[in-house]
């Protein structure tokens, strides 16, 4: 599971996801990519599940790049706890993804293999995505 080694602060505000992604929306490393079409928080477990599904399908061929990193802590209160007494403790990490953000890249495989592998990864994501080919 991906998570930061250390952070400046343990807890963060939730924030809001406005607009589209202006950074990380171009293919940089591979030839094929999976691009987000909706805003969402994507957990480190979901990122890892998508990566594993792609790697398992592509086997030894090709290389996979994960272009998002979960750097936002999400806090949860214990079950059946009364309100008050501060914010809950950090439970898991998420990546804030806006529309047009590249999630995964792939290279060194044919388009059919890449498309099928990305489709498997897309099924693990909580958002709609699209398959992109580098021009």
Curated annotation (Swiss-Prot):
One Gene Ontology cellular component term attached to this UniProt record is: chloroplast
Q: Where in the cell is it found?
A: Plastid, Chloroplast
InterPro entries referenced in this protein's UniProt entry, alphabetically: Ribosomal_uL16, Ribosomal_uL16_bact-type, Ribosomal_uL16_CS, Ribosomal_uL16_dom, Ribosomal_uL16_sf
Which Gene Ontology terms cover its molecular function? Answer: rRNA binding; structural constituent of ribosome
GO-annotated biological processes: mitochondrial translation
Sorted keywords for this record are:
Chloroplast, Plastid, Ribonucleoprotein, Ribosomal protein
Which family, according to UniProt? Belongs to the universal ribosomal protein uL16 family.
Assembly and oligomerization: Part of the 50S ribosomal subunit.
PANTHER family documented for this protein? 50S/60S RIBOSOMAL PROTEIN L16, LARGE RIBOSOMAL SUBUNIT PROTEIN UL16M
Q: Which HAMAP family match?
A: Ribosomal_uL16
Protein name per the record: Large ribosomal subunit protein uL16c
From which organism does this entry originate? Nuphar advena
